[in-house]
Amino acid sequence: MTATWEKKEGNEGLLKVTVPAEKVDKALDQAFKKVVKQINVPGFRKGKVPRPIFEQRFGVEALYQDAVDILLPEAYGEAIDETGINPVAQPEINVTQIEKGKDFEFEATVTVEPEVQLGDYKGLEIEKQDSELTDEDLQEAIDHSLGHLADMVVKEDGAVENGDTVNIDFDGYVDGEQFEGGQADGYDLEIGSGSFIPGFEDQLVGVKTGEEKDVVVTFPEEYHAEELAGKKATFKTKVNEIKYKEVPELDDEIANELDSDANSVDEYKENLRKRLSEQKAEEAENVEKEEAINKATDNATIDIPQAMIDTELDRMVQEFGQRIQQQGLDLQTYFQISGQDESQLREQMKDDAEQRIKTNLTLSAIADKENIEANDEDIDKELEKMSKQFNISVEDIKNTLGNTDIIKNDVRIQKVIDLLRDNAKYVESTKEDK
């Protein structure tokens, strides 16, 4: 077999392939064995028609399409390997010759992976992230954990304060008329949660149990119900009950309840500090890595073919469908609720799809340029890491994956990201202190 590759405009080219006549004859034999089983010829049992009789009656041409179907997949795959091209979409095939006793010839118009013109990827200016855990961070985490153990206690006297949970009845009016979805009885609302229209919760601060108040708010311009967007509304509201959180004091018993490995408050704080420090350091590292990736990608120039974008959008729509399925919805139901269709969803995802592709191509191109590869030791380490993380044996992971190509590529790309970060120039954060 011979194959030639001729680059055309953009990311397309013409692949010309010639398969020897001997293989054509073998494919015709296979095609005959398949087709003859379906043929009825008077004087012969089904499937027992001799080849010469078949060709005399139907012509050898009747076998050509089946022979092409047999020859094409293998020949196309071998041609890709021989020419070293990397297709990103299904080719357009044009058979130029298929005939008994002659070579099989075809042309394939192929869209290939685009060339990447790398820009600067070393010495990138990256903002240094604060990875130090402060005493304030630790106390905030402790307070948050204690909050989960808090009891809700009815406030017998006093007014609504921020952080309280109020039970309310409300009746909403726009232009003096009630509107759909604007009424409720016995609704529990945490003040300060931001779950209601801006301004609603603030106006309940200071109100006492049993009191009524007209809460006046304006719906946001981008409110999901278009008929209410930007309009002023009055909610006649009654406070039925006020509850506040009674947070327990941190002692040795509570410390052990929050962390079974801690037998005292000091041990709990020490364990928590260590865990939070590791978490904050990891978060800081991830932010720095993301900035390095984005800058290296922005500095690269790539003409992404539409076929790659379409394929990535197919993948993203599928991923989105799987996520909403976990929430009990399917895509069609989502489209009905949102008023969107798939074409609109794909248009919303288009920029992200292009960025994903550009990022992957850029990192892969850097790996090629820097001769970065994942060796067996790297792969074994990653498998051990996955085994501990998911509590699955290495053998089970290998059996599930089938091969380690995905892990090999992931490790390779991670090495590229480490290279970007290790060679970056770090500058102090310009953000104001929190």
Swiss-Prot record:
Annotated compartments: Cytoplasm
GO MF: peptidyl-prolyl cis-trans isomerase activity; protein folding chaperone; ribosome binding
Enzyme Commission code(s) on record: 5.2.1.8
Reactions it catalyzes: [protein]-peptidylproline (omega=180) = [protein]-peptidylproline (omega=0)
Residue span, PPIase FKBP-type domain: 163-248
Entry keyword annotation includes Cytoplasm: yes
One of the record's GO cellular component terms: cytoplasm
GO biological process: 'de novo' cotranslational protein folding; cell division; chaperone-mediated protein folding; protein transport; protein unfolding
Keyword annotations from UniProtKB, A to Z: Cell cycle, Cell division, Chaperone, Cytoplasm, Isomerase, Rotamase
Recorded family membership: Belongs to the FKBP-type PPIase family. Tig subfamily.
Domain notes: Consists of 3 domains; the N-terminus binds the ribosome, the middle domain has PPIase activity, while the C-terminus has intrinsic chaperone activity on its own.
Chain's role: Involved in protein export. Acts as a chaperone by maintaining the newly synthesized protein in an open conformation. Functions as a peptidyl-prolyl cis-trans isomerase.
HAMAP family noted in UniProt: Trigger_factor_Tig
Protein name, UniProt field: Trigger factor
Recorded name of the encoding gene: tig
